[in-house]
Amino acid sequence: MSNYWVEREAKHIEEMLKRHVNYEQEIHRRYLQLWKTIEAEIQQFYVAYAGKEKISIDEAKRRVSKHDVQIFAEKAKRYVQTRDFSKEANEQLRLYNLTMKVNRLELLKSKIGLYLTDNTNQLQTYFTAILTEEAVAEFVRQAGILGESVLSEETYRLFAKAIIEGSFHNTTFSQRLWANQDVLKASIDRLLTVGLVAGKHPDILARELRKLVVIDSLRGKETADYVARRLMISESARIQSEVQKQSYEKYG
């Protein structure tokens, strides 16, 4: 391989790594915003039902008022109307609508679940857009390397869609993304219940919940933030590899 091609490939790898850094920063920003929303909801919960720094589990398990239910239902309706929820997101929301009327604690869990669903739905859209652009660009790049004519962008987008929606080890990227949310939701629900039983101060509970959602270092492998970042990078690498493979099979 000539120096030209070696240098060209090295530059491509360098640019790809820079993009990966940008992707991780954007995902982190989204989870940080999600956390701030969750924290505010927890603080509001304590203010509304405690009037002091502690709330008993008995108080938390009292039935919610019709007014509280109506407020949540209206908020959920606005999310559906303005966010273009996916099939997965609508299914999650249906479950929250079923459980929110049980008691105040379940209403809090449903509110947080709504924010999680919105975040994951937006991440799915973000992932799909980024991966599509990467796949199209790589198809064009491979056509240039192999000396073939560049096809239309529409054609490449169809190729990209098939790759992105394809499974890897019998699971698609979107399934992995929603599974990450399921793990996070279950962990938050469990911590909320245990925290209220123990009578934890809301600030302590908030700090413990933050460790599940977001962390300021990539060392925190248990956070949903970290898992989503790793998923994005691994999917980006998979897309690049699959486009190259298909290009070589077609033109090589």
Over which residues does each language-model region extend?
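N-terminal leader/targeting and assembly helices and adjacent pre-domain segments
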Residues: 1-218
